[in-house]
Amino acid sequence: MISSLHRPTLAKVDLSAISENIEQVVSHIPKQVQTFAVVKANAYGHGAVEVAKHVSKQVDGFCVSNLDEALELRQAGIEQPILILGVVLPDGVPLAIQENISLTVASLEWLTLAQKQGLDLTGLTCHIKVDSGMGRIGVRNLKDADNLIAGLKALGADVEGIFTHFATADEADDSKFKRQLSFFTDLVDNLTDRPRLVHASNSATSIWHAATVFNTVRLGVVIYGLNPSGSVLELPYNIQPALSLETALIHVKTLPAGQDVGYGATYTTTDEEVIGTLPIGYADGWTRDLQGFHVIVDGQLCPIVGRVSMDQITVRLPKVYPLGTPVTLMGENGGVSITATEVAEKRGTINYEVLCLLSDRVPRSYD
């Protein structure tokens, strides 16, 4: 989708806030660790290349979801280690070796397929994924982990790391977290050939369970200034949201009582009302379930009335404003703010999704 550069809708990314968030989290981890910044899904909507370039001297490497995301960073000149957290099938190995991209290997079946294809894994760096209770990808016992490490090394691979992912590190009840941690710790401690890097700490673990980190951490949503738990757990220190979403009024009119607004006529004016139109809609990631939410105009919360359309939304204004008046959808305006977590709570989802769904049609600018 092409970016719409000639309209006032814009996501502003504060790169210095991301740097400060990394510094804040790492300073609260009680031992020396390697830090990988997670920039998958276009850095959670913030711009993977721009973020990676800005923080490259602060971190030891980057994590992405798939091979194409890794290649984007390499093609942009990023030289630090890049680990793909998802599974790349063996036919992607030659390209990973060529571009010095580390792969996650999550099963003996992957190894068997590589052997059947006659692959030489010399030059490949990989990390073993352990399923300690998430139920997605990864080996589930010590024997499989040992066999996988030995088999990969026999084909020439450098098994640099082993890791797991916690399902509930961002919840108040830590019983499942403790079970996963115990499982993974026991497995790692009993490996025949333990890899150099051991990591289990995502953002939530690094914040609320910092004492449990191994020798590497993966920092994701927290570096973008979002609370990984939404509003479930209080953050023990301050972080700064790095993205604000802004637009401007493109149409303002006064409607008499009894006038319908938007598709389906789901909103009807009850009195004389000033209605403003904004150039953003569900094609931009501002989804239909945000009807009834609000934006900020001139330091005042203004409700979204009528359905969210593909390209436009309508809001009720306290008075007539001139065209071009700035409007904030996420961020601060006149001492009033809207957070991604508040947007997520209105939508019944998580703040991660709010930012990841901001489409390419919304240009990003960088400070």
From Swiss-Prot:
Q: Which GO terms describe its cellular component?
A: cytosol
Q: Which cofactor does it need?
A: pyridoxal 5'-phosphate
UniProt pathway annotation: Amino-acid biosynthesis; D-alanine biosynthesis; D-alanine from L-alanine: step 1/1
**What organism does the UniProt record list as the source?**
Streptococcus thermophilus (strain ATCC BAA-250 / LMG 18311)
Q: Which residues carry this modification: N6-(pyridoxal phosphate)lysine?
A: K40
Q: Which SMART domains match?
A: Ala_racemase_C
Entry keyword Isomerase: yes
Q: Which GO terms describe its molecular function?
A: alanine racemase activity; pyridoxal phosphate binding
Database matches in Gene3D superfamilies: Alanine racemase, Lyase, Ornithine Decarboxylase, Chain A, domain 1
Q: What is its EC number?
A: 5.1.1.1
Arranged from A to Z, the UniProt key words for this protein are:
Isomerase, Pyridoxal phosphate
Mind telling me what this protein is named? Alanine racemase
Regions that span the bilayer: none
- Active-site residues (renumbered): K40, Y263
Catalytic reactions of this protein: L-alanine = D-alanine
Q: Which InterPro entries match?
A: Ala_racemase, Ala_racemase/Decarboxylase_C, Ala_racemase_C, Ala_racemase_N, Ala_racemase_pyridoxalP-BS, PLP-binding_barrel
